[in-house]
Regions:
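N-terminal single-pass transmembrane signal-anchor helix
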Residues: 1-26
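Long, compositionally biased, intrinsically disordered regions
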Residues: 23-355
Length: 355
């Protein structure tokens, strides 16, 4: 994609959302058309089905907020929203197979009530953030780490404002926001007295569309401690602005849990806890940004960080059309959607049997 095209893409994204909203039909108008025979304009039928998934809240309308609720009709729109293509943060999060409260594709398929249709949903930030550790400068009292941070769409650089957070044991460094033309180098300094491993979080906001915010993180060794894979010590679950941290190992002690957005960061309040888990209340932040949540703790003498994003994206769920492509017609439809006022890219694949 040429750079000029990418510029136009982001500059016009909000306008496209408004156009899509104006074109949106109600569920009463959409659903009868979706039951037409396959032979009657199959591409248009598939398009209407893809819209239906994003424009309707499903039944019960608040099924995303309870881990005991399973939708009887499927849709992921936010209940009561005046905007079209405005998705519910908890319904989206429960589509992620890594979420402890995830619903299965079999449950989604059954709730859609269209046995001749398979579907797949992908939701991701509007552009990518890549983090690479490029240099380490070890001193007597501290170590400086240099990172290369790239922001791009299909390999084309995306100018963005960046906010970086560095986390280690009882240590938080918040860098002043900076602007990148697609690639920039950032230094973070961690004292030698602080135990590792460490973590850097980068949130990137497009200069063309302030509601388009992407993110990434990078765990790295500090001192002699190397990072373990995410999920080694805690299983983090998100639902209804509550974080549940379930212990994956014995002798786990939680130190601090923090939430980070582009404009804000906050230490979360623990609401309940026992010897197997702890729960935290997640604030409703004012800015258009995903929330990155980091829990720190120790396992005996080992310090660790665990992290999760709210909404829990990027995600892909549904039918595996890579293995079904010789058996099904498949159409893909791309939409700009909002989740808690931030803009994301959503691709819906719809497939049916060949004629």
């Amino acid at each position: 994609m040429p750079a000029a095209s990418v510029d136009t893409f982001f500059a016009c994204s909000l306008m496209v959302l408004l156009v899509l909203s104006a074109m949106a039909s109600t569920s009463k108008l959409l659903y009868p058309y979706m039951n037409y025979a396959v032979g009657k304009n199959v591409v248009e039928r598939y398009k209407q089905i893809s819209r239906y998934l994003l424009l309707n809240a499903g039944t019960p309308s608040d099924w995303g907020k309870s881990n005991r609720a399973t939708p009887t009709t499927f849709g992921i729109a936010k209940t009561g929203s005046d905007e079209s293509y405005d998705l519910d943060v908890d319904k989206v999060t429960r589509l992620n197979g890594e979420n402890v409260y995830a619903i299965s594709y079999a449950q989604m398929f059954s709730a859609l009530k269209m046995p001749d249709i398979s579907f797949r949903i992908e939701i991701k930030p509007m552009f990518e953030v890549t983090i690479n550790l490029t240099a380490t400068y070890a001193g007597t009292n501290e170590t400086i780490y240099q990172f290369e941070i790239s922001t791009a769409k299909h390999g084309v650089p995306i100018p963005a404002d960046l906010k970086c957070y560095s986390i280690a044991e009882e240590y938080l460094e918040t860098a002043n926001p900076l602007t990148s033309n697609g690639r920039v180098y950032v230094n973070t300094t961690i004292p030698s007295t602080v135990r590792g491993p460490a973590l850097i979080i980068v949130l990137a906001r497009s200069v063309y569309q302030r509601k388009a915010v992407s993110f990434n993180s990078y765990s790295f060794a500090h001192g002699s401690a190397k990072p373990e894979p995410n999920g080694t010590f805690l299983r983090l679950g998100l639902l209804n602005h509550t974080l549940t941290a379930s212990f994956a190992q014995s002798n786990v002690t939680l130190l601090k849990t923090c939430a980070f957005t582009f404009d804000h960061n906050s230490t979360l309040s623990r609401t309940t806890s026992d010897n197997q888990s702890a729960r935290y209340s997640i604030p409703h932040f004012a800015d258009s940004s995903p929330i990155i949540i980091v829990s720190t703790g120790t396992n005996s003498t080992t310090f660790f960080t665990e992290q999760i994003a709210y909404p829990q994206i990027p995600l892909q769920t549904g039918a595996d059309f890579a293995t079904l492509k010789t058996h099904a017609k498949v159409s893909a439809y791309t939409y700009f959607v909002t989740i808690d006022s931030a803009i994301y890219e959503c691709i819906v694949w719809i497939g049916g049997l060949k004629d």
